[in-house]
UniProtKB/Swiss-Prot annotation:
Subcellular location: Endoplasmic reticulum lumen
Transmembrane segments: none
Active site positions: 221, 340, 453
Name this polypeptide is given: Carboxylesterase 1C
EC number: 3.1.1.1
Signal peptide positions on this chain: 1-18
Motif Prevents secretion from ER mapped to chain: 546-549
């Protein structure tokens, strides 16, 4: 290993394959899996890593647009030491996201396949003992249309905090979301895959040193939305015990406004499956090749497909479930970043607002174009411009303020409303706002953007311990965030000795500002929530409401 030590002397991580003397082999309910040991500098106990462990049958043929089924058993020792293919998606955009948010040093080979229901496991446990460590299950983001498990290395988080980290995959885009609005294709296949992965964890994680009675689900963006959908789903009862939503909750997506049949009809027309019945349409789409569906995906407006109120995963709208308090009231961390629309989202959307300047007329026409996504009627646009843009005459500042408005509508306000509902139902709730610019982000990003969408991921996964270039300040911030997240996974409370106090989100609405300075504050987005609540109460948007039959 001297060569490894010499070549990578400047790095914080040096993988040592086959250490201890033989690689780890673990029994699952379906068969044995072979992993590999990876050591992190400063830790005597290596992390056992298992990549591409199947948790369901490949969702092919008749299982396309159908609930996942348990994997078939195998009689040999399955080699799980290479990254699995990511679920089918637009490869160009998928690579862009993976490059931007990859938390580890290792280059992840980007392969895509419809056969993708796999998970990765990082366990610091001595597998010869009954360790029962807390388990943290990561649900990746990417708008439910792109992304995968492997860009998120659980190596540093598992080693530093002595937790078992599991990163899961789920069907994306048309494969994960296609719904006819009836029993022929109810939709929410992505969430059913997530539930199948959590059931697999319940049945198997003890043999990897994890405690099935201490499972925390955490995710970012669409992963955060998924976490909150699972909290609201009766199907997820007892599958997890704590939850963390980073930059996304299910209230973000206006699910009760989605016209499922119209979207299905558009897909049918574009695909040439324009049949008279739902059953025939589904049958026709099942005959399409993966490449044909991928071509269809690229043609589709990505915002047209989403989680639906299917009567199964979600029996009612999120708002109704929260009002009735009929959900899994587990301890919950909810948070978002200071500038969610700072750079990465506008870039992924094709350089949204590429002009460096903005005036009221431009803002008004822009808001009209996006009014369906914002769930607003056009009549309220003047009030929004008055609230957000009138405080300055600087056209560059006006653009920043308009992006702040998008951050509020899509992230800040839904997070606060969700947290209030969780609190009122008796779930121990903690809120944060992340305010830091990681050193690992693209050089193309403006220096002024602090706390962009996805920035907290580098701290959560301990990237300063896996990649070179982090300052002492950034390294310490990552230690702090990992400690908060892991304490919460252990105890349902992020607080611990030597940490800044994180207040519970109660009627005082205390929260934590996390960044170069980490401190308590109160009433996160309180003024903005009051503005939007009053505005929408007086001017409800005229949109269609469809549910499954």
């Amino acid at each position: 290993m001297w060569l490894c030590a010499l070549v990578w002397a400047s790095l914080a991580v040096c993988p040592i394959w086959g250490h201890p003397s033989s690689p780890p082999v673990v029994d699952t309910t379906k068969g044995k899996v072979l992993g590999k040991y990876v050591s992190l500098e400063g830790f005597t106990q290596p992390v056992a890593v298992f990549l591409g462990v199947p948790f369901a049958k490949p969702p092919l043929g008749s299982l396309r647009f159908a609930p996942p089924e348990p994997a078939e058993p195998w009689s040999f020792v399955k080699n799980t030491t290479t990254y699995p293919p990511m679920c089918s998606q637009d490869g160009v955009v998928g690579k862009l996201l993976a490059d931007m948010l990859s938390t580890g040093k290792e280059s992840i080979p980007l392969e895509f396949s419809e056969d993708c229901l796999y998970l990765n496991i990082y366990s610091p446990a001595d597998l010869t003992k009954n360790s029962r460590l807390p388990v943290m299950v990561w649900i990746h983001g990417g708008g439910l249309i792109i992304g995968g498990a492997s860009p998120y290395s659980g190596l540093a988080l598992s080693a530093h905090e002595n937790v078992v980290v599991v990163t899961i995959q789920y069907r994306l885009g048309i494969w994960g979301l296609f719904s006819t609005g009836d029993e022929h294709s109810r939709g929410n296949w992505a969430h059913l895959d997530q539930l199948a992965a959590l059931r697999w964890v319940q049945d198997n994680i003890a043999n990897f040193g994890g405690n099935p009675d201490s499972v925390t689900i955490f995710g970012e963006s669409a992963g955060g939305v998924s976490v909150s959908a699972l909290v609201l789903s009766p199907l997820a009862k007892n599958l997890f015990h704590r939850a963390i939503s980073e930059s996304g909750v299910v209230l973000t997506t206006n699910l009760d406004k989605k016209n499922t049949q119209a979207v299905a009809q558009m897909i049918a027309t574009l695909s040439g499956c324009n049949n008279t019945s739902s059953a025939a349409m589904v049958q026709c789409l099942r005959q399409k090749t993966e490449a044909e569906l991928l071509e269809l995906t690229v043609k589709l407006d990505n915002t047209s497909m989403s989680t639906v109120i299917d009567g199964v995963v979600l029996p009612k709208t999120p708002e109704e479930i929260l009002t009735e308090k009929s959900f899994n009231t587990v301890p919950y961390i909810v948070g978002f970043n200071k500038q969610e629309f700072g750079w990465i989202i506008p870039t992924m959307m094709g350089n949204l607002l590429s002009e460096g300047r903005m005036n009221e007329k431009m803002a008004s026409s822009f808001l009209k174009r996006f009014s369906p996504n914002l769930n607003i009627s056009e009549s309220v646009i003047p009030a929004i411009i008055e609230k957000y843009l009138r405080g300055t005459d600087d056209p560059a500042k006006k653009k920043e303020l308009l992006l702040d408005m998008f951050s509020d509508v899509f992230f800040g306000i839904p997070a606060v409303l969700m947290s209030r509902s969780l609190r009122d139902a008796g779930a121990p709730t903690y809120m944060y706002e992340f305010q830091y610019r990681p050193s690992f982000v693209s050089d193309q990003r403006p220096q002024t953007v602090q706390g962009d969408h996805g920035d907290e991921i580098f701290s959560v996964f301990g990237t300063p311990f896996l990649k070179e270039g982090a300052s002492e300040e950034e390294t310490n911030l990552s230690k702090l965030v990992m400690k908060f997240w892991a304490n919460f996974a252990r105890n349902g409370n992020p607080n611990g000795e030597g940490l800044p106090h994180w207040p519970k989100y109660d009627q005082k609405e205390g929260y934590l500002q996390i960044g170069a300075t980490t401190q308590q504050a109160q009433k996160l987005k309180g003024e903005e929530v009051a503005f939007w609540t009053e505005l929408l109460a007086k001017n409800p948007p005229q949109t269609e409401h469809t549910e499954h039959t």
